[in-house]
Amino acid sequence: MTTAIVEGSVQAVAQASGQSIAESFVMCDVIVIVDTSGSMAQRDSRGEKSRYEVACEDLEAIQKSMPGRVAVISFSDEVEFCPGGIPVYKGGSTDLAKALRFAKMADVSGCRFILISDGEPDKPEEAMSVAKTYTARIDVVYVGPEANPIGRFYLEKLAKASSGTTVTSDRASDLLSTVTKLLGNGDSV
């Protein structure tokens, strides 16, 4: 996937308005936390693309439709803020607890969180503990296989812990419409 700056991303809006990336980030009301671990390379999504590739395509469309409102954070072994809008595929493990601790800084009134993942984190109890500290809801888009009920059930439990909703997106085939539905067509969060 390209490292180009996505239209509508935090970085694009900052450049267009003469603001710093930090100033643009604080205007975001949606934080999308994207799993970039090894399993996201599975090529079982639309057009035989990987879950990661489809997630990136749809993230681009979401940011274009909601300019300056969506910040992207990626995670695998490490966590990274992605001001340009597209996470770099990292492979590796699934350190969701670390990602939730990182994103916690944005847990303020009016902010929404959407977690896009395909399975179980490395430290499920730790991730659940962090999720329970959130005041904002964490909605989950499960993009893994239906044949993995353990991963899906865990993510459902995590969403419920923060009063969030879980949606299964058929192996990332309809991620854009799923996220748009969770956000109420992008009009308000």
Model-derived features: positions:
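Short beta-strand-loop
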Residues: 44, 61-106, 124-129, 151-157
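DG-centered beta-turn motif at the end of beta-strands
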Residues: 34-37, 55, 72, 110-128, ...
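VWA/integrin I-like adhesion module and closely mimicked acidic/polar interface patches used
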Residues: 87-94, 119-161, 167-169, 177-180
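Acidic, polar low-complexity linker/tail segments
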Residues: 1-32, 36-48, 188-189
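…and closely analogous acidic/polar surface helices at protein-protein or active-site interfaces
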Residues: 26-30, 38-70, 88-90
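Conserved phosphate-coordination/catalytic loops
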Residues: 11, 49, 53, 90-97, ...
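Residues at the starts of beta-strands that form the adenosine-phosphate
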Residues: 29, 69-71, 112, 137-139
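A charged, well-structured terminal subsegment
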Residues: 173-188
